[in-house]
């Protein structure tokens, strides 16, 4: 496995791979890898000749009062895992390499970027789409792999890819969970044992919505209120949002008959966590499954 630090070197590698007729799979990450990331890597490994994992803690997607400074950084451990998984290249540039003169040019998906997490974290998705756009230019991959856990991010990036005509296939992989249902997240490392238990309320809220949908309820307002009531039962959780929306537009819907995204975000202590499930239709929901 080769660690690449500069844009020029990474671009040269990709040109060589394409000349050789090799397909490229890209897994963008901010490091602090867990089993969810590794599931993306393993999927990419089975579908591409070469796999590139980017590790870059992107400062422009963090707000002024967010956790940029303390975001987990475990580069050596991450590289050991990726080497074990057969990754070919790790692209890990510094901030000065990615933004040598600061950032004057942004990629912004209007409308979608202000919904769900974008409403609570102004400017977050503009930072995400800007760095992902740069990565897609630096690493012209055939496939890029993202996790369903970041459902709003997936919707925003999918719209960016369509609007900007990126020649890349987005591969969205299922959420990976602990046995008790907690969605894996790098930010879970912030939780103490008590908070770790409190965090399970997100999973319980989603399961309540799924259970009601499976018994025939289709009214989105009723289902969302039922999920919010579960969050309200946990004193250690502060609800940011629990909404039922169209998975592509992130617009609220009234009936779940044609499918819906149930998205939730809550603060546990000082840690903000997100989770979601997709309801296929009343009586047929695809949601949290333990792995």
From Swiss-Prot:
Active site: 37
GO MF terms held by the record: ATP binding; pantoate-beta-alanine ligase activity
Annotated family: Belongs to the pantothenate synthetase family.
Function of the protein: Catalyzes the condensation of pantoate with beta-alanine in an ATP-dependent reaction via a pantoyl-adenylate intermediate.
BP-aspect Gene Ontology terms: pantothenate biosynthetic process
Chief place where the protein resides: cytoplasm
PANTHER family (alphabetical): CYTIDYLATE KINASE/PANTOATE-BETA-ALANINE LIGASE, PANTOATE--BETA-ALANINE LIGASE
Functional pathway: Cofactor biosynthesis; (R)-pantothenate biosynthesis; (R)-pantothenate from (R)-pantoate and beta-alanine: step 1/1
Binding site for (R)-pantoate: 61, 153
Subcellular location: Cytoplasm
GO cellular component labels: cytosol
Entry's EC annotation: 6.3.2.1
NCBIfam families the UniProt entry points to: cyt_tran_rel, panC
Assembly behavior: Homodimer.
GN (gene name): panC
Annotated ATP binding sites: 30-37, 147-150, 176, 184-187
Organism (species): Koribacter versatilis (strain Ellin345)
Other observations noted: The reaction proceeds by a bi uni uni bi ping pong mechanism.
Swiss-Prot/TrEMBL catalytic activity: (R)-pantoate + beta-alanine + ATP = (R)-pantothenate + AMP + diphosphate + H(+)
Binding site for beta-alanine: 61
Official protein name in the record: Pantothenate synthetase
């Amino acid at each position: 496995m080769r660690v690449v630090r500069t844009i020029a070197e990474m671009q040269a590698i990709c040109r060589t791979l394409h000349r050789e007729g090799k397909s490229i799979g890209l897994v963008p990450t901010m490091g602090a890898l867990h089993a969810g990331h590794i599931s993306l890597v393993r999927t990419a490994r089975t579908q591409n000749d070469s796999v590139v994992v980017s590790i870059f803690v992107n400062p422009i997607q963090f707000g002024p009062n967010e956790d940029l400074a303390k975001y987990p950084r475990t580069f050596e451990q991450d590289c050991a895992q990726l080497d074990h998984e057969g990754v070919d290249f790790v692209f890990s540039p510094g901030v000065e390499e990615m933004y040598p003169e600061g950032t004057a040019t942004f990629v912004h998906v209007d409308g979608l970027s202000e919904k769900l997490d974008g409403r609570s974290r102004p400017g977050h998705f503009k930072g995400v789409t800007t760095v992902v756009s740069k990565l897609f230019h630096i690493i012209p991959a055939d496939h890029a792999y993202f996790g369903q856990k970041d459902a709003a991010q997936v919707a925003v990036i999918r719209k960016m890819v369509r609007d900007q005509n990126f020649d890349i296939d987005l591969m969205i992989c299922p959420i990976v969970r602990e046995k008790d249902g907690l969605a894996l997240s790098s930010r879970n490392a912030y939780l103490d044992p008590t908070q770790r238990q409190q965090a399970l309320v997100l999973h319980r809220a989603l399961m309540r919505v799924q259970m009601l949908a499976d018994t025939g309820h289709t009214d989105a307002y009723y289902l969302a209120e039922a999920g919010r009531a579960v969050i309200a039962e946990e004193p250690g959780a502060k609800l940011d949002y629990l909404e039922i929306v169209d998975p592509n537009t992130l617009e609220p819907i009234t009936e779940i008959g044609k499918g819906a995204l149930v998205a939730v975000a809550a603060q546990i202590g000082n840690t903000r966590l997100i989770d979601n499930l997709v309801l296929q239709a009343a009586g047929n929901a695809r949601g949290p499954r333990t792995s």
